[in-house]
Amino acid sequence: MITLGSLFDGIGGWQLAAVKNGVKPLWSSEIDPFPASITGKHFPDTIQLGDITKINGAEIPPVDIICAGSPCQDLSIAGRREGLDGKRSGLFYHAMRIVREMREKTNGKYPRFFVWENVLGAFTSNARRDFKAVLEEIGQADIPMPASGRWARAGMVRSKECGIAWRVLDAQFWGVPQHRERIFLVAGFRGWGGTSRYSLTQKACAGILRRAKERGKCLPEMLETVLARQAHNGD
């Protein structure tokens, strides 16, 4: 069975989504006692780990998927916009520390996927450099800014560590009567056999760009950016 760990768990949204799709939550991290009491009632078998800053990824049960909806206050346009340097939104780095500790302990086997959710302000905070920092922290590689200077609402980058894809989703199209847009990012790590299987090779991406140029065709900006990155970075 596919297993899941939930960081910044709140009232257990990730866990609820997991059980509805045949995934078993093993553990969660939430520092606020009230929401933790709610998840304790609805998911009594889930191990509650508490404060994320005190968790060692090498010492907790390995899981296939780690989810993290890290605090958005420092990224949101409604806040002071301290970005990832802020005390709350900067907790994202603890999530990635836990991921790396677990992968090192399991020789790269777990987690297989990392899922991150946050506000659209992550695209623009700190002169648009915070989302670049998120991608680089997950991919452990230098990720260039888009040619337009703006992050697309959907995109993909790859590194030797993993393949990363993101997309903006709006709650109103998912059964909730409100307009609420959020970034959802999924990283698939090397070693599980999926990233290379379902992605174009470096040579293929370079060929698409070359033929488009030869024929005078203009590719959509997002597609051209993704192809250019893959043609440059490869595996």
Which residues make up each language-model segment?
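Short, well-ordered alpha-helices that flank and scaffold nucleotide-derived cofactor binding pockets
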Residues: 16-20, 41, 97-100, 136, ...
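Intrinsically disordered, low-complexity and often Lys/Arg-enriched segments
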Residues: 1-3, 110, 203, 235
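Short glycine-/small-residue-rich Rossmann-like dinucleotide-binding loops
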Residues: 71
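Class I S-adenosyl-L-methionine
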Residues: 55-63, 75-198, 203
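Anion (oxyanion) recognition and catalysis
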Residues: 19, 139, 213
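N-terminal Rossmann-like NAD(P) cofactor-binding module of classical short-chain dehydrogenase/reductase
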Residues: 65-67
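SAM cofactor-binding core of SAM-dependent methyltransferases
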Residues: 2-55
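C-terminal target-recognition/interaction regions appended to catalytic cores
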Residues: 148-151, 198-235
